[in-house]
């Protein structure tokens, strides 16, 4: 409150434009959106997100107040158009020419800076939105979800790493469930043209004797159905990517592997606790581990390994995943 017990502001609507629209980036932007609603409970707040995430955004934000969810594709791109439509204020969740991909800044903090010109006040404000309910359970059997897709080699869950984990999970009586897609809705510039990012995985390299034990749900779920699947799972096991961030909007156990970054800059906080029902896994004995988190300049694209071998993914050790699952009660 300010003078005379009144809020400071002009009463115009606020437009949060999530043009940095990859699933993980959008989810990491939601704590800032929620903080904006809490700071100003009266103004209209519009959230412009990718159309393929519209239903998910409505569902995740509903417990936190009133928001108008709009499709980013319909957002007026010029200032003249926005003024003509009297849209109000606008903030984007991305800085221009963002090839540094948030090196030493947590993605939630980055979104706070872009959308609110502020930083979060502690871990509770940094926490993912977890209040939205889950839909019905898909399987009666206990199961563990493996997000298998990656947008780059240095985030690829390699078959050599995955296979022993799947084998152990199956031996403990859990059904391994594979999720993912082949083509991302996210686009990146290639040769001056925005094109969809291709998703890669190594499922075909898993031994046939293991593949037959898995339920393959790749390409078979909507985002909300995927969230339900993650939330009801006994655990979600994977490498840094959008599906793990989606799991972070539920109460699921998570094993979160990373190579180019470190937990300090990529942790998932729930209810103010970055260690809640989660274990972080990194490569063993690799000097360049956390390369992105060590880099202090902009303009290097860490989707691509500087050494061109993405060694960090091959040096993830299955035992570290399995020990994490044991610690989480599996």
Regions found by a protein language model. Give the residues of each.
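Catalytic machinery of carbohydrate-active enzymes
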Residues: 1-330
């Amino acid at each position: 409150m300010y003078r005379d017990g009144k809020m400071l502001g002009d009463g115009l609507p606020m437009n949060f434009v999530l043009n940095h629209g990859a699933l993980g980036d959008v989810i990491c932007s939601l704590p800032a959106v929620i903080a904006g609603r809490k700071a100003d409970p009266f103004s209209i707040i519009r959230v412009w997100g990718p159309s393929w995430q519209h239903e998910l955004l409505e569902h995740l934000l509903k417990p936190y107040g009133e928001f108008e969810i709009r499709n980013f594709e319909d957002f007026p791109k010029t200032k003249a158009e926005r003024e003509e439509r009297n849209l109000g204020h606008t903030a984007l969740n991305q800085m221009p020419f963002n090839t540094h991909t948030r090196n030493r800044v947590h993605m939630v903090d980055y979104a706070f800076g872009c959308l609110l010109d502020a930083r979060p006040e502690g871990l509770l404000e940094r926490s993912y939105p977890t209040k939205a309910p889950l839909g019905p359970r898909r399987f009666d059997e206990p199961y563990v979800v493996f997000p298998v897709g990656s947008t780059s080699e240095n985030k690829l869950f390699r078959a050599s790493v995955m296979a022993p984990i799947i084998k152990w999970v199956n031996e403990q009586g859990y059904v391994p469930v594979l999720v993912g897609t082949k083509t991302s809705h996210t686009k990146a510039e290639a040769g001056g043209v925005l094109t969809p990012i291709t998703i890669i995985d190594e499922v075909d390299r898993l031994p046939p004797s293991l593949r037959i034990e898995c339920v393959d749900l790749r390409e078979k779920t909507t985002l909300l159905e995927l969230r339900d699947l993650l939330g009801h799972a006994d655990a979600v096991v994977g490498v840094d990517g959008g599906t793990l961030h989606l799991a972070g909007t539920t109460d699921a156990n998570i094993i979160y592997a990373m190579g180019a970054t470190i937990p300090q800059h990529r942790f998932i906080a729930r209810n103010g606790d970055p260690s809640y029902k989660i274990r972080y896994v990194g490569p063993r004995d690799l000097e360049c581990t956390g390369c992105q988190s060590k880099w202090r300049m902009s303009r290097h694209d860490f989707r691509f390994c500087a050494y061109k071998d993405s060694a960090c993914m091959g040096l993830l050790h299955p035992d570290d995943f399995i020990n994490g699952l044991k610690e989480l009660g599996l």
